[in-house]
């Protein structure tokens, strides 16, 4: 019997895959046989490009594409390149996201909108443009967050964007079903990687006290969730939010 987690021949795009959870995801998809697309957005210091290059060194013949997910023209160009060079797309993981915490009283409109623009509008734009090259039977996995389910202090922008991704996932699941494309979301809890790095130790211990399983999540537990939702094992799962949070939110 074929390994359901063998992605040989599948084309996989993980947005924001130059570092953090996205980088770990694309590495595992590669190890399981997928043709991988690494996405990053250029920054003034060239750090994101360098990070993407380092990830690409560990992969087998990847595409590496500079694309700002908030710019429709760039996203459309990325999809055209994937279509031209790989013939289509089988699995899309909308992972790109930013965080910028501040209380509502202190948060500027730009601080609110910039996070929503990347996290939510970026997910919409990539999904919309990917529709042109997504093959029948494909998979879309969106990264939400426990913050979007609970509403965390100081995260009006981030929580709002991640809550909206859940609604967007459900709408997308209905609309893409006619192409037998499933659309699901993962809602990570407090994970020991990526944007959580640099959090003060006392804050981390405070988080842990809220988690029934008594520990932070490991990035591989998020990767495993993405693998499952992208695999034939989840062929009858769509419009679902998979909580990977140690029990901090049960709903």
Where are these regions (language model features)?
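Residue(s) in the substrate-gating loop at a strand-loop-helix junction
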Residues: 145
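Substrate-binding pocket helix/loop in short-chain dehydrogenase/reductase
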Residues: 103-104, 111-113, 196, 207
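Active-site helix of classical SDR
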Residues: 127, 161, 169
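The beta1-alpha1 cofactor-binding region of Rossmann-like NAD(H)/NADP(H)-dependent oxidoreductases
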Residues: 66-77, 109, 221
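Short C-terminal tail/terminal secondary-structure segment
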Residues: 2-3, 150, 209-210, 227, ...
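Alpha-helical segment proximal to the catalytic Tyr-Lys
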Residues: 132, 174-178, 235
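Conserved glycine-rich cofactor-binding loop
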Residues: 18-19
């Amino acid at each position: 019997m074929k390994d359901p987690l063998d992605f040989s021949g599948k084309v996989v795009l993980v947005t924001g895959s130059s570092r953090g959870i996205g980088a770990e995801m694309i590495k595992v998809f590669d190890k399981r046989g997928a043709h991988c697309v690494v996405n990053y957005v250029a920054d003034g210091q060239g750090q994101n490009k360098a990070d993407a290059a380092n990830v690409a060194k560990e992969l087998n013949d990847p595409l590496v594409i500079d694309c700002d997910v908030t710019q429709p023209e760039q996203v459309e160009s990325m999809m055209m390149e994937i279509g031209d060079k790989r013939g289509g797309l089988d699995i899309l993981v909308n992972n790109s996201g930013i965080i910028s915490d501040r209380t509502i009283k202190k948060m500027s409109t730009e601080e609110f909108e910039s996070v929503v623009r990347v996290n939510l509008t970026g997910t919409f734009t990539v999904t919309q443009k990917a529709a042109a090259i997504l093959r029948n039977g494909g998979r879309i996995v969106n990264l939400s967050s426990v913050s979007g389910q609970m509403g965390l202090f100081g995260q009006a922008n981030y929580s709002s964007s991640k809550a909206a991704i859940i609604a967007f996932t459900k709408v997308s699941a209905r609309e893409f079903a006619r192409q037998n494309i499933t659309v699901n979301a993962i809602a990570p809890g407090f994970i020991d990687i990526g944007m959580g790095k640099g959090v003060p130790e006392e804050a981390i211990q405070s988080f842990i006290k809220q988690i029934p399983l008594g520990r932070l999540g490991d990035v591989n537990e998020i990767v495993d969730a993405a693998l499952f939702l992208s695999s034939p094992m989840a062929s009858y799962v769509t419009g679902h939010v998979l909580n990977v949070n140690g029990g901090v939110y049960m709903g």
